[in-house]
């Protein structure tokens, strides 16, 4: 599995700001969008382009535009919604697929409760977004659903990842790509990433 930790100074700075204990909901949302945007920039670096001729202000001009498979953005509910706008800044025509999965706090296992995936997902590149890759259970379950629908081009974008989650994801889906703003130290006994960001969903939705 290709794992990319984006070490751009802007990314490192913004993730650092997100770690503040008393960060406001407004600021956390803004930063989640901004970092999601920067991760999208990295994750799409290998997208193919084609040369076309258009009518410019002073006559015909040759430009490059994206070609090949179109994109579906797949936020994992609910926290993944906090990164979605950052992806759509670069890919405004992307279709949106939604997967609802929550983590059982006792077993730490993923529990699916909702899915609405575009009908032609097998023809698209899926960008799966979720702020935290902790145990990896929710991401693995989401990718399982996408593959069952025939999707073969999948990239996962997360703000923070734990080594344990990366290992689990690689074992389950070695053919995908993972882009993260930070690989943190470890998980604690409750399955939270250390140093992490806290509960990203609560911070995005103001329910902390």
From Swiss-Prot:
GO molecular function: GTP binding; magnesium ion binding; uracil phosphoribosyltransferase activity
Superkingdom to which the source organism belongs: Bacteria
Entry's EC annotation: 2.4.2.9
Residue numbers binding uracil: 193, 198-200
Involved pathway(s): Pyrimidine metabolism; UMP biosynthesis via salvage pathway; UMP from uracil: step 1/1
Regulation of its function: Allosterically activated by GTP.
Protein name: Uracil phosphoribosyltransferase
Organism: Shewanella frigidimarina (strain NCIMB 400)
């Amino acid at each position: 599995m290709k794992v990319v930790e984006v070490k751009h100074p802007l990314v490192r700075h913004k993730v650092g700001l997100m770690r503040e204990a008393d960060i406001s909901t407004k600021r956390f949302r803004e930063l989640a969008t901004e970092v999601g945007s920067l991760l999208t920039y990295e994750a799409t670096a290998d997208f193919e382009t084609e040369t076309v001729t258009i009518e410019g202000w002073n006559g015909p001009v040759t430009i490059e535009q994206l070609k090949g498979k179109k994109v579906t953005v797949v936020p994992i509910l609910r926290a993944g919604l906090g990164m979605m706008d950052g992806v759509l800044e670069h890919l405004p025509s992307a279709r949106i697929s939604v997967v609802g999965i929550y983590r059982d706090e006792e077993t730490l296992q993923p529990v699916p409760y909702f899915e609405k995936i575009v009908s032609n997902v097998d023809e698209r590149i899926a960008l799966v977004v979720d702020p935290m890759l902790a145990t990896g259970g929710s991401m693995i379950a989401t990718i399982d659903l996408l593959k069952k629908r025939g999707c073969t081009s999948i990239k996962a974008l997360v703000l923070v990842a734990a080594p344990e989650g990366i290992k689990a994801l690689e074992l389950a889906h070695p053919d995908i790509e993972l882009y993260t703003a930070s690989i943190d130290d470890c998980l604690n006994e409750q399955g939270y990433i250390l140093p992490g960001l806290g509960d990203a969903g609560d911070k995005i939705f103001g329910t902390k």
